[in-house]
Amino acid sequence: MKGIIYPRKSSADAYVYLSPGVREHLFSLLVKYTSSQRDSPAGSSTKVAPDTPQTNFIVEIQWVCHKILLEMEEQFGSLGGLVADINICLIWTLFRNYKHKHRMNNSDTGKSCAEYAQSVVKHLTERMVYCTDKFFINSACSGVTVPQNLALVIASISQVCRNKCQGAWRRMGNGRRTLIDLGLQLVNTYNLLNACGAIDDKCKAFIKLTFPYLNLETVYSPVHAASTGLHQKMAISLYKGQEKRKVPNATIYSNLVTQEKFALPEILLGEITDEGLLANKGPDLEKLLSEPQTILKLVTKLSPVSQFQVFMARWGDKLPSHLKDVCVSDSSQLPQQYENFKVVWPQHQTWPNDETSALPIASASLLSLQAENLPTSVQNSVAQETTGLPPQVPAGEMPPRGNCPVEDHGLLNSDAPDDLSGKGDYDLFTSDDLLPMSSGNVAIPVCEDPLAPPCKKQRMEPPDPLSTPGDNQWGDGAASAWIQSYMENEDAYLELILQGLYHLDEPPKLEDSIQVQDVSNSTNDPLEGPSRSQASCFEDTENIANPLDLFV
């Protein structure tokens, strides 16, 4: 075994609070990875060690990373996203340090891992630089009180990652022990301060928003493609930039140290493309943090359990038999109807964790705005602006082609049908499964006719609370009670909803039916989320000037 460097147990087993089972599994994968790189005998094209199929090896590594995400969420809660990034970066640093390019052609087990290890480490390092930088800028602008000891540890992590970004990429494998020590110090400091009550709920909610969980599909998709011979043109990157670029010599930064200056990493100057990171809507997040308990109960489509569900459905058959039976919890099981039905689900939402209780609800009324309490003129005005139909259109009749309205099923009447599934080609969505204390449903038309002109969402301008009776299209007066209540109580959640990042873990239980779409004969992959026509009604929501325009 001349020339082969095998990992040492003491160094390869060092991570930030991983369970013994996960550490043992990682060490066995690393040994298999290095063993597959042994030289072939002279004059022979056969490999010394039998190889594991490359795809199965990558799937097993991804399975371990999913287990890490689940452990970090269970142990550290809001801080789990940052600790998970550190641990996954440590794993790929080992793959990068133990690879041998001139021997990889003799191996099928870890060839694609060796090719992409450098890119993955760079991606995770830049991700930590971006998130830690946003942490300090947004906390100061949002009125978040961060304990000094916790801020010092996060600043040290940011400094280590910045130094890696400014140096040559061939040095990305350095500093693993330093990152481990800082990760342990981060967890110990956070737990100690939390036990003393020094970290309030607002700070925890802010940490959760700033350090989201990594989307493992972003990292492993190009690795899977490389294992099948489909190399992607561009490596894994966190921002839009040149594919190949010469790294400046470190000497150009030497004079900055004496002047107490520093160079900004390139990641802070480019446009971020990584999924899940909080969009840069400005540094002031005080509105979002007005109800921190609500944010702490929110989950993302990138939550560990949601990612684990999709992973097991897609790659479960590639796992060894002793891993297929491992279940994280009862909530990690996919719904039974997942194989044949795809729920009409917004573009940025996660798949449900259980069967019918968390499925999106199709409301039986276009106006859950307490319509029975509104004047008749207001009901007619809202109906016409929302559906694009005159108030007196008989049930079942459709207006001329091209208007793309929502079908009128007599929903404004007391005898409105309770089941809307399968009626027409127009999908109805509700905001009750998205917003707490919601007072209104969303009904946005979806244009399914290929011959019709582009579908435009029709919106109403919200009334001015200070206006006098008769000043606006709402009929008999100023803003109704429901719109005033919405503006006072739910403004803090609007930005989250518009960005499409979060939804309630336990949506309100309504008595309406569930709208599902049979895709058993469809060519769409049920794991890829809703089709383009279904998701089109939620596009461009981030560009809405007034958030209230989304609900009309």
From Swiss-Prot:
Gene Ontology molecular function, alphabetical: DNA binding
Tell whether Disulfide bond is among the UniProt keywords: no
Please give the superkingdom of this protein's source: Viruses
* BP terms from Gene Ontology: regulation of DNA-templated transcription
Q: What is its main location?
A: host cell
* UniProt entry keywords in alphabetical sequence: Activator, DNA-binding, Early protein, Host nucleus, Transcription, Transcription regulation
Q: Which GO terms describe its cellular component?
A: host cell nucleus
Localization:
Host nucleus
Family in the record: Belongs to the herpesviridae TAF50 family.
What this chain does, per the record?
Transcription activation.
Listed name of the protein? Putative transcription activator BRLF1 homolog
Species annotation:
Bovine herpesvirus 4 (strain DN-599)
Q: Which gene encodes it?
A: IE2
